[in-house]
A protein has these predicted regions:
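Canonical positions in the second alpha-helix
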Residues: 5, 38-39, 72-73
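Canonical tetratricopeptide repeat
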Residues: 18, 52, 86-90
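Terminal, low-structured helical/coil segments at or just beyond the last alpha-helical repeat
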Residues: 67-97
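Structural signature of tandem alpha-helical TPR/SEL1-like repeats
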Residues: 25-38, 60-69
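N-terminal leader/linker segments that initiate helical-solenoid repeat arrays
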Residues: 1-8
Length: 97
């Protein structure tokens, strides 16, 4: 369904966001990341996509990129501010180890 929507509306950031969630459920990190990057390309201020990509980078031990994405999110967040703060603590704790 989402893929069909993308064919008719290739700039539908929500379709890519939903696809990234589907790939997360299938544990396909490569396609999850690809779709999150597409969302951010279409709309660089999509909080959920930036947060999810930061989490994904953290899971793959890319602390630097995760922190960078989280700082970007924190600079304009409205809905994901609390999640961003928790993620910042999580990153800092992992960096201490």
């Amino acid at each position: 369904k989402f893929e069909k929507n993308i064919v008719y509306n290739p700039k539908s950031e929500l379709s890519y966001l939903y696809l990234s969630k589907i790939f997360k459920n299938f544990d396909n990190k490569k396609l999850q990341e690809q779709n999150l990057n597409t969302v951010i390309l279409l709309n660089p201020k999509t909080e959920e996509a930036i947060f999810n990509l930061a989490k994904l980078k953290l899971e793959s031990s890319d602390y630097k990129k995760s922190r960078e994405l989280n700082e970007k999110l924190n600079s304009f967040c409205k809905n994901f501010c609390n999640k961003s703060k928790r993620l910042k603590s999580e990153i800092e704790n992992l960096l201490k180890k």
